[in-house]
């Protein structure tokens, strides 16, 4: 089945300068965002868009890579943004303060959740985000996981938090659990099973569950969402393939949210995706 794809590049030249090659891009923190859309056309089409990071999105413009048959649903986008901004930061001086999305974060959320196909389902179903350290990666990933679990209107949604090991995967989970505890509306409806690293949204029977790179029993999922944290640390591509190839076929709009800081293993699945994004951005695909 053929797919469309969208590639974004967010490059903070003020902080890093513009890197000249892929290794520099990995070292200096080029922000690459890839989105793979639901099957539409005969040939895979890839796009690239470069956006600078600013404090707050002043005027949102829907991605120019929206399909002609798709549309921007402002209500759907506003809902996603408002859901996330009803959550709180969980650590340090920002703890318990509202999670106000900054420019590049809001652009991502509005394009993912606001660009819809004629049937009302999301056009884009995969996001790859590569960002420097200390840019709020865990908070954004946790917020997206909660939105997919609790706010996406999906019955019995299965949302999985994946990483190289259970400890790494638990980082985003722990942030999500704290966000739930700080949100009265969610804390009344979500059961937190810390020992199992599982959240249950009781009104729909939906779950958010931590998984690690041990793929021996990682089959048979009916995935509505996957949040892959620190993709560059995956020891191989097995977990990535299990969780992204076919696991969401029974869902109408699964979302694979891949987020990572930079790595240097040129044989990793993360580098493979990074290179695909680089090719798209530089017009080779």
Mark where each language-model region is:
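Phosphate/NTP-binding elements of NTP-utilizing enzymes
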Residues: 1-5, 10-17, 21-25, 29-285
């Amino acid at each position: 089945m053929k797919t469309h794809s969208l590639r974004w590049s967010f490059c903070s030249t003020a902080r890093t300068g513009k890197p000249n090659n892929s290794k520099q891009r990995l070292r200096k923190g080029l922000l690459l965002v890839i989105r793979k859309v639901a099957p539409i056309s005969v040939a895979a089409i890839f796009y690239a868009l470069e956006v600078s990071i600013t404090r707050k999105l002043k005027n949102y413009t829907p991605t120019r890579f929206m399909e002609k048959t798709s549309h921007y649903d402002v209500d759907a986008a506003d809902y996603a943004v408002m859901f996330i901004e009803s959550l709180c930061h969980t650590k340090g001086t920002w703890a318990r303060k509202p999670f106000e999305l900054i420019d590049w974060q809001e652009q991502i959320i509005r394009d993912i959740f606001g660009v819809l196909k004629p049937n009302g389902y999301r056009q884009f179903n995969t996001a790859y985000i590569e960002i420097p350290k200390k840019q709020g990666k865990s908070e954004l990933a946790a917020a997206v996981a909660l939105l997919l679990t609790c706010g996406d209107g999906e019955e019995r949604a299965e949302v999985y938090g994946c990483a190289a090991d259970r400890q790494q995967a638990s980082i985003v989970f722990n942030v999500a659990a704290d966000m739930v505890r700080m949100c009265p509306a969610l804390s009344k409806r979500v059961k937190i099973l810390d020992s199992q690293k599982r959240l249950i949204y009781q009104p729909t029977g939906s779950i958010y569950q931590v998984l690690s790179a041990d793929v021996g029993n990682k089959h048979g999922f009916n995935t509505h969402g996957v949040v892959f944290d620190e993709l560059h640390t995956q020891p191989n591509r097995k977990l990535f393939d299990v969780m992204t190839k076919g696991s969401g076929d029974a869902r109408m709009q699964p979302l694979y949210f891949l987020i990572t800081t930079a790595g240097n293993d040129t044989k990793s699945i993360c580098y493979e995706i990074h290179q695909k994004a680089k090719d798209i951005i530089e017009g080779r695909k």
